[in-house]
């Protein structure tokens, strides 16, 4: 890369919109550049600002000793603005040391990403169910009244955008829309229109929040209400059980918010679907990280989402939230074709500092599953129901199949990625049906990961999780303070006897897996990521609490690490 010569040329200076409300005007100036590389057909065209140019000048002076630049401070309003920027471009194009500098490389990457991202946002908004500028008021609080560009995507998600660069146009096809920044999203699942009047409608969400949206005209109000009602019908039709898998790759992010004092961040991504999650590696000191990390989950609910949460790692305090996106499974092609999605990161609330987008590659395989759970089924019934309805297939109030699974897995403790590598969805469905109908199953050693998938599925489909809904808040509150062993033991003692007996079976088994982590790569931390969300979950899963999601893993890890002391006490 060092031998490649970069030529940068100023293509002009033009007016742009400043940071005003959507309906207001106002102009500032931007500089347009074109970058070419020797021996390459790649050409970059991007726009930047006076402040970005001055930041580049400052960083070049810090990075390159005794550098001689033609200008020390750039003013885009100066009478010599075009001449000055051309002199700077000539200096950079004729100085290989500047072209190879980290400051210049980062400048090109950041400013080009910002321009590409703006174009992406324009296309993202344009290709939607409906969009328009509305006044949004939350819970009838006038202080929350904000003018937002509202967009419904995938017939499932309501996005709202504000501007980082303003404009005077409300036309969706206007280039001014490129200046928008995502300010939040709401899922239309379990939402309903509770009131409609002249030029306004009220939307009630699943967590009982109300939003009043005021439209410019009554006709537009009618279009919004009709579209939302159609979306609600679509969601209802998409609600059914499946046997499937979602696979994909978190490719990269761009233009992330700086969370550290050095102007960078240390981002990582947590991906979640149903009661499963995966954490990517951390990419240190980057606002444009390349992850290229694969994920896969088993799926039982077609109406669900795959969530992506971006965090900034911090060694001395809790990770900082950097944004979220959600992909509805019903959006994805039913034939398993892979699609690539650029999605804008969304904040949780107005206090979050969030910017940037994330690129995901994703594919979804599924087949419809049975709708109702038989009272005699092993999968989908509570532990108490299994013990009551099928006592002949239980031992110590534990389903015999769990003993059989564990006996089989203990013969494969050195299997790399046990419980982490995805099994074949068709095989998992076959195993599930076999368990539901036969008292004894024959295990195939060549399908270890399929049996591991069926084992995980049993705990995900429990109507009452192993650690119980009643103790969710107590366990989360304990973890928020700092997990202590004795209070944890006292909480565990309150579990129903069948839950305790299953835990007594699992903990020694997990200890054996962790003891062989050098070969199977499944230490206590990885086990907690796989099983924690299944063992401990909130009753209403329609809203994902990000901080609690991390605490769930911490609790599970603490239980696994202290299993010997816990077993002695229960």
UniProtKB/Swiss-Prot annotation:
GO annotation (BP), single: small GTPase-mediated signal transduction
Chain ranges of the PH domain: 127-233
Location(s), subcellular: Cytoplasm
One cellular component (GO) term of this entry: plasma membrane
Positions with a binding annotation for Ca(2+) 2: 260, 312, 314, 320
Keyword Calcium: yes
Molecular function per GO: GTPase activator activity; metal ion binding
Site description Arginine finger, residues in chain: 420
Domain named C2: residues: 224-343
Domain Rho-GAP, residue spans: 381-567
Listed CDD domains: C2 (cd00030), PH (cd00821), RhoGAP (cd00159)
Main location class: cytoplasm
Cited InterPro entries: C2_dom (IPR000008), C2_domain_sf (IPR035892), PH-like_dom_sf (IPR011993), PH_domain (IPR001849), Rho-GAP (IPR050729), Rho_GTPase_activation_prot (IPR008936), RhoGAP_dom (IPR000198)
Residues where Ca(2+) 1 binds: 260, 266, 312, 314
Cofactor(s) needed: Ca(2+)
Keyword terms of this UniProt record: Calcium, Cytoplasm, GTPase activation, Metal-binding
Highest taxon, organism lineage: Eukaryota
Pfam families cross-referenced by the UniProt entry: C2, PH, RhoGAP
Role this protein plays: Rho GTPase-activating protein involved in the signal transduction pathway.
Protein name per Swiss-Prot or TrEMBL: Rho GTPase-activating protein gacEE
Gene of this entry: gacEE
